Amino acid sequence: MNDETSQPFLAAVWMLGAIASFTLMAVAGRSIQAELNSFELMFWRSLVGLGVMTAVLVILRRSARAILTEIRPTRPALHLTRNLFHFAGQNLWFYGIMIIPLAQLVALEFTMPIWVALLAPLIVGERLTWVRLSVAALGFAGILIVAQPGVQVLTSGHLAGILCAIGFAMNILLTKRIMRHDSVLCVLFWMTVLQTIFALALAQWGGFTWPSPAIWPWLLVVGLTGLSAHFALSSALTCAPASTVAPMEFLRLPVIALVGVWLYSEDLEIAVFLGAGLILLANWINLNTTRYRRHKV
């Protein structure tokens, strides 16, 4: 993607769709977890996604042979590992939205690119530079401001927010390796299949709860937004470079904060925005440093 082919307005439209999807997913997740635990939620979310992906494959590939060719994974173990991390991260995210204010969770989730920078040397063989270490230190300072240890009680929700960011970072890095060999449709298909199995197995602990009709619409919402959010984000990245798209995603924080105030009477804390500002600055430095290196090469 270069400046001549970049379409920033279209990228912004796609990012608005992604932000709306992530926000709806959070609201639906809170509504569902009034009845179901996070494993049960993930089962229905993945099952809806599997239905959608199957329909897409049938429409696009038509023949059974073409579908089987499309979804045949080159490295099954890598798909399994990737989905274990993504499943853990997504469960922690849904758990976190029940424990801490939405704005705090999203601010902690924004540390994901920092974890990508730190873990990339281990997963994809990239160099760990002083710039990346400095960016990580700045990001962790932002985490401390958001969580405010010593000022407020640290909860399992704060830990869930940090760990979900690590899970999502591992997902990004492993997806990067998988995409060298397999298609997007293959990745999404196995994501929905494997995570349906994971969730169903774990949901049996303590007994599986069947959802009441009152939350069926929310289950549909969380299943559809799980796919639409990532599709919109991927589409935005095809319209403009990451350096243009990434700042747009950070609009999710004020949006989710206002939703928290409006629907759940959560407080708008200055510390959350100050800490998020440091995290976003760290991400911006990391993004532009990476972009500079690529242009230099």
Feature annotation, model-predicted:
Residues 1-14, 114-166, 177-180, 280-297:
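Juxtamembrane helix-loop boundary signature in multi-pass membrane transporters
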Residues 10-18, 65-92, 156-164, 203, ...:
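Loop-to-transmembrane-helix transition segments
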Residues 40-43, 47-48, 95-125, 242-259:
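Specific alpha-helical transmembrane segments that line the substrate/conduction pathway
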Residues 10-11, 36-88, 167-171, 190-206:
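Transmembrane alpha-helices of multi-pass small-molecule transport proteins
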Residues 254-297:
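C-terminal-most transmembrane helix of multi-pass membrane proteins
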Residues 105-111, 178-194, 230-261:
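Helix-helix packing/entry segments at the starts of transmembrane helices
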Residues 27-30, 38-39, 53, 151-211, ...:
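Transmembrane alpha-helical segments that form core, pore/gating elements
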Residues 19-27, 54, 83-91, 113-118, ...:
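Hydrophobic/small/kink-forming positions within alpha-helical transmembrane segments
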